[in-house]
Design a protein with these regions (language model features):
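C-terminal hydrophobic helical "lid"/dimerization subdomain
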Residues: 271-323
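Short, glycine/polar-rich helix-capping loops at beta-to-alpha or helix-loop-helix junctions
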Residues: 93-96, 171-179, 243-248
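Hydrophobic/small residue at the entry helix of a nucleotide-binding pocket
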Residues: 152
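Adenosine-nucleotide cofactor-binding segment
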Residues: 145, 161-219, 270
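Glycine-rich phosphate-binding loop and adjacent beta-alpha segment
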Residues: 171, 218-289, 323
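Short glycine-centered segments of the SAM/dcSAM-binding site in methyltransferase folds
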Residues: 83, 142, 166, 231-232, ...
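NAD(P)H dinucleotide-binding glycine-rich loop of Rossmann-like/cofactor-binding domains
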Residues: 37, 46, 77, 86-149
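Glycine-rich beta-strand-centered segment in the early N-terminal region that forms part
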Residues: 22-39, 49-91
Length: 323
């Protein structure tokens, strides 16, 4: 029997249990994927703690890469042995095998390794949505990226530089500052500093056109103060906790600001949207415009250790669970 990580009670990393599970047969429109690499994301932590409450027991995880192991009767676009990857709107990736709808899988190009794919499906497609759909970053504009040394942040930094933007990167340590400088950040601010004051100084008092903030509660209001008039605040994560309710007048008095709290799956809702976004991501990776930094790997059965490292801000780039 195959194995999976399951959660029977919400809580700390210790609730992640390595268990035997049934090997299921695919339905007519499904593909069974034998996982080789699984991406770790903060959304996995939210699901483990119960911030995003699913029905227990839960197999966590949203992104993975692997090999097609079995096909449903109506699936024509894949064959057994094909290399595939996915990002899913539902949990289930922390497992040796998984059933997936065929229209939510993408073929992996030959030049993209399994661990690379697992490290970038959710994070890379999030970066694509942030920089190419939610706010189309333009050459010459100045943007701010929080947690710029993290999985999404490091991809977004490289993508923004490819588009010709100037990037102010906010990070949590000198080691992470060195990493984002290696990836061509124009300015670096440490998170314990007065970020808004630093940003205003770096931009001649004007501020930035857009802030991408995955940290949440601890950085939200300072992020608003980094924006120029009519700037856009994109809050897309809760690493420090959910953002508290905000009165619309707070946006008005800070310069008629715009605020959005996007979810990736609204931007890849159809198979066509998914395939288009994935192709754009893969093309940039294959041409070397974006490098995927896998900072650390753990065997799947040690997922609890990986969660502890992620929550304590000890990781850089992406973390991959291996089988």
């Amino acid at each position: 029997m195959p194995n999976a990580i399951r959660i029977h009670n919400f809580g700390g990393p210790e609730v992640l249990q390595w268990e035997s599970v049934d090997l299921l047969e695919p339905g007519p429109d499904q593909v069974r994927v034998r996982h080789t690499a699984i991406g770790l994301n903060f959304i996995d932590v939210y699901e483990r703690t119960g911030l995003y409450q699913g029905q227990l027991p839960i197999v966590p995880g949203r992104e993975a890469a692997g090999v097609v192991d079995a096909l449903g009767s109506r699936v024509k676009q894949f064959a057994v042995g094909d290399r595939v990857a996915y990002v899913a709107s539902s949990t289930g990736a922390y497992s040796e095998y998984r059933l997936m709808p065929a229209d939510r899988l993408v073929h992996l190009p030959d030049g993209v390794a399994d661990q690379t794919a697992a490290a970038m499906m959710l994070k890379g497609l999030t970066a694509q949505a942030l920089l190419r759909q939610i706010h189309r970053v333009r050459k010459g504009e100045t943007i701010l990226i929080h947690a710029a040394a993290g999985g999404v942040g490091l991809i977004a930094l490289q993508w923004a530089k490819h588009l010709g933007a100037k990037v102010i990167a906010v990070v949590g340590s000198e080691a992470k500052a060195a990493l984002v400088r290696e990836h061509r950040a124009d300015h670096v601010v440490l998170g314990h500093e007065d970020v808004a004051a630093q940003v205003k100084s770096m931009t001649g008092g004007r501020g930035v056109s857009v802030v991408y903030d995955s940290v949440g509660k601890d950085t939200f209001f300072a992020s608003l103060d980094c924006l120029q008039p009519r700037g856009l605040m994109v809050t897309y994560g809760n690493a420090s906790g959910p953002v508290p309710p905000i009165a619309p007048l707070e946006l008005s008095k800070r310069g008629s600001l715009f605020l959005t709290r996007p979810t990736l799956f609204h931007y890849i809702a159809t198979s066509r949207e998914l395939q288009r976004a994935a192709k754009e991501l893969f093309d940039l990776v294959l041409k070397g415009a974006i490098g995927i930094h896998v900072g650390q790997t753990y065997p799947l059965q040690y997922a609890a250790q990986a969660h502890r490292a992620l929550e304590s801000r000890q990781t850089t780039g992406s973390t991959v669970l291996t089988i």
